[in-house]
Amino acid sequence: MTPPSDLVTVSVTVSTDPATAFVLFTQDINLWWRRGPNFRIAGKQPGVLRFEPRLGGRLLEEFESPSGPEVVTTGTITEWQPPARFRFEWRGVNFAPGESTQVEVVFEEVPTGTRVTIRHSGWAALPPDHPVRHGQQGPAFIRIMGLWWGDLMTSFREFVTDRAGS
């Protein structure tokens, strides 16, 4: 069992079927994922965030830096089961070699559409003074990560809603 200080769980319900939600989440991630230094390595600079949609594919961020074009791999897909779920190994830009966390994204049909659930775990394996924690420990850090994922899932829900209205 995963300890409570190791797991972030956030769910949102979107008004579309699981197959469409899966495609919008994975293929249109650059359109709904928030911008700015809290959400993208490139910060406010123009760039593209995208999944390579397959087992072993990557979550990439491509952008122009002062030293030229950059491509940063933030994740590697470890399970790919459209339209039900996928998992990827997530690495922050300040992670050392061998450090990673795991993100699972599940798409479940519900009467009002699709429940999309994010489970982000593996935090307990990182040292208490790891830079990704920004000085926060245990439950306080998990709360911050829950708010971060909550902001992203709100963006996803708004994106799906706007798309359905157009």
Language model region names:
Residues 39-60:
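A solvent-exposed, acidic/Ser-Thr-rich amphipathic alpha-helical stretch
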Residues 1-46:
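Hydrophobic ligand-binding cavity/cleft-lining segments
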Residues 9, 46-47, 103, 144:
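Alpha-helical scaffold segments that form or flank carboxylate-/histidine-based iron centers
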Residues 19, 57, 84:
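Glycine-centered loop/turn positions within well-structured domains
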Residues 25, 32-33, 48, 80, ...:
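Tryptophan-centric aromatic hotspots in well-structured domains and transmembrane helices
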Residues 21-25, 59, 77, 88, ...:
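Hydrophobic pocket/interface hotspot
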Residues 94, 122-166:
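A conserved amphipathic terminal alpha-helix motif
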Residues 50, 60, 64-115, 121-123:
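Hydrophobic-ligand binding "helix-grip"
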